Amino acid sequence: MTKQNAFTREDLLRCSRGELFGPGNAQLPAPNMLMVDRITHISEEGGKYGKGELVAELDITPDLWFFACHFEGDPVMPGCLGLDAMWQLVGFFLGWQGLPGRGRALGSGEVKFFGQVLPTAKKVTYNIHIKRVLKGKLNMAIADGSVSVDGREIYTAEGLRVGVFTSTDNF
């Protein structure tokens, strides 16, 4: 059976409700924290490291919730939301691979911000390159990612780490 390699907004909303990978498994956050409108490509191969990749998009409109509060008179998408979106996508990759448990961001290496998302932008694109997937007692992925706005790269993150846990009691 071939795995689905692209996901619509409705698919991602199903994932946020726990309906895509099954109860107790990886979920995306619900809106407003869901920072992705679609995954245009997901693969177990390819990417910079040949271990998998994801490409996803977020449509930008001036009425997005964060522009009203960050900052008044100087609206800009918080950089941490772009970083969170990359963690969301690494966790989605683990669920898509069939690894059981709830996703948790575990950290990252170097993060760089060298641009911004303004209300005049049209589209944010996320590119995730899987470096390694650990399967066993700990199921975890390590990836590098980037965020682009209207075709221009504005953030990068190295060593994004996300794990999935069948119990988060001691997390």
Curated annotation (Swiss-Prot):
Name of the gene this protein is made from: fabA
PANTHER family tied to this protein: 3-HYDROXYACYL-[ACYL-CARRIER-PROTEIN] DEHYDRATASE, 3-HYDROXYDECANOYL-[ACYL-CARRIER-PROTEIN] DEHYDRATASE
GO biological process: unsaturated fatty acid biosynthetic process
Chief place of localization: cytoplasm
SUPFAM superfamilies for this protein: Thioesterase/thiol ester dehydrase-isomerase
Entry keyword annotation includes Lyase: yes
Disulfide pairings: none
Catalytic activity: a (3R)-hydroxyacyl-[ACP] = a (2E)-enoyl-[ACP] + H2O; (3R)-hydroxydecanoyl-[ACP] = (2E)-decenoyl-[ACP] + H2O; (2E)-decenoyl-[ACP] = (3Z)-decenoyl-[ACP]
Top-rank taxon: Bacteria
Keywords from the UniProt entry: Cytoplasm, Fatty acid biosynthesis, Fatty acid metabolism, Isomerase, Lipid biosynthesis, Lipid metabolism, Lyase
Gene Ontology CC entries for this record: cytoplasm
Any coiled-coil regions, as ranges: none
Subunit description: Homodimer.
E.C. number(s) listed in UniProt: 4.2.1.59, 5.3.3.14
Entry's family note: Belongs to the thioester dehydratase family. FabA subfamily.
Pfam families: FabA
Pathway: Lipid metabolism; fatty acid biosynthesis
Catalytic-site annotation from UniProt: H70
Name of protein: 3-hydroxydecanoyl-[acyl-carrier-protein] dehydratase
Entry's localization field: Cytoplasm
Disulfide bond listed as a keyword: no
Recorded GO MF terms: (3R)-hydroxyacyl-[acyl-carrier-protein] dehydratase activity; trans-2-decenoyl-acyl-carrier-protein isomerase activity
Function statement: Necessary for the introduction of cis unsaturation into fatty acids. Catalyzes the dehydration of (3R)-3-hydroxydecanoyl-ACP to E-(2)-decenoyl-ACP and then its isomerization to Z-(3)-decenoyl-ACP. Can catalyze the dehydratase reaction for beta-hydroxyacyl-ACPs with saturated chain lengths up to 16:0, being most active on intermediate chain length.
